[in-house]
């Protein structure tokens, strides 16, 4: 590492929980330590959660950013890609690790990878990463974009954002740096990232030619890809589907080509009036990525950047080409996922998933949102989380977060957290709707804590314990309020859950805590009213008494 950096990062357990590990047996006698976040409930029970924070939440870990994180056990460099090994029937250490993490069988993980419906982004040269899987049979994942720009940010800030994003649940990180020290920034992130790291190599290639797309060459791009593979990048966005003949299809769009990589390649194609060098050299690119087991993230360079442009001819023409490239990559043993839009109104979202599955052999779909409306700058983490939840339910495997700063500026630390939390909500909502076998367990645990007024347990089980506690304590800060049977919204007399508990307590006190007892009580009450009616002469109407 050639640049001196002293990042300030957040470490230590998340409130109400501790770092724990589950030991599982891996291949070749290797013991794997699978991380989890263990929530300690006031009932004395523990509740374990999927954890992406790496050693940064482990108080026993020694963190030295200049040295980087330790290598994972069981790493094998010379047996081919995860796809090739899965096809050969091998359950790798990464697959065994993932199976324990997801609560699934290792054979299911192997089978989904072998079929190309799931990917394990795990470059041989990124041993610091904890293995994870992206595929629709598993929990929906969330990616957080970080990276500097030519205008602002530093290496220290981007390392801090990486640690901060993974603390709150980012499953992967993309370093989209376009400013100074791109190589050094990526090196610091990779050596300290507990999750897979993705990049868009064309950005660094463009920086090497001083920002002039027309000066790009295949040789320059190829060398940049090799440089990043050597560093340990786990997956790469490659806009190989932007073809010369597709560029005119964007001419009448409201927002044209909004992908940075897509616009760079479109400019090169038009300047040279030749087919994209990413497309014409794709097989050589496959050979390079296969050597390191780097996963393709085939970029949607012609994605719609506005509601008006959703699902148009340009977008779907590129998707068909991505389907063609998917087959080529898999034939070379390279794992593939497909990037998707973008800006899409709700009623057009599912069509994107179904077409991607049809054209791309069900390769994992990785989508940016999509934003369901264009009218809310500063709130696009919300407009996009709406679309993200819908597309996750339909089968998207990973969601690329959008922050409140989208379309406005480079996100800071707070924006990163807001984006991650919004997308963890969307991903979890998608898992619930898909019927993921473990998704509802957390909802049930939190709902039970809510009904029993176990406030500290509610905070600890939530996606953001700090903010949940902060909001509660704004109006009821005293410690006894953590056991009170109300909050400041309804107060003690109008709390529906307290009233329901009172009703249940009354029922239990009077022996009405079973269906049979309630039925008997109803019959007794009806008999009492029948007798009262007879006592009044069986008259329907009685005289009014003063």
Swiss-Prot record:
Its EC number is 4.1.99.17. Keywords: 4Fe-4S, Iron, Iron-sulfur, Lyase, Metal-binding, S-adenosyl-L-methionine, Thiamine biosynthesis, Zinc. It catalyses: 5-amino-1-(5-phospho-beta-D-ribosyl)imidazole + S-adenosyl-L-methionine = 4-amino-2-methyl-5-(phosphooxymethyl)pyrimidine + CO + 5'-deoxyadenosine + formate + L-methionine + 3 H(+). InterPro entries: ThiC, ThiC-associated_dom, ThiC/Bza_core_dom, ThiC/BzaA/B. Its cofactor is [4Fe-4S] cluster. Pathway: Cofactor biosynthesis; thiamine diphosphate biosynthesis. Binds 1 [4Fe-4S] cluster per subunit. The cluster is coordinated with 3 cysteines and an exchangeable S-adenosyl-L-methionine. Gene3D superfamilies: 6.10.250.620, Radical SAM ThiC family, central domain. The keyword Acyltransferase does not apply. GO terms for biological process: thiamine biosynthetic process; thiamine diphosphate biosynthetic process. Zn(2+) binds at residues 343, 407. GO terms for cellular component: cytosol. GO terms for molecular function: 4 iron, 4 sulfur cluster binding; carbon-carbon lyase activity; zinc ion binding. Substrate binds at residues 145, 174, 203, 239, 259-261, 300-303, 339, 366. [4Fe-4S] cluster binds at residues 487, 490, 495. Belongs to the ThiC family. Catalyzes the synthesis of the hydroxymethylpyrimidine phosphate (HMP-P) moiety of thiamine from aminoimidazole ribotide (AIR) in a radical S-adenosyl-L-methionine (SAM)-dependent reaction. HAMAP family: ThiC. This is Phosphomethylpyrimidine synthase.
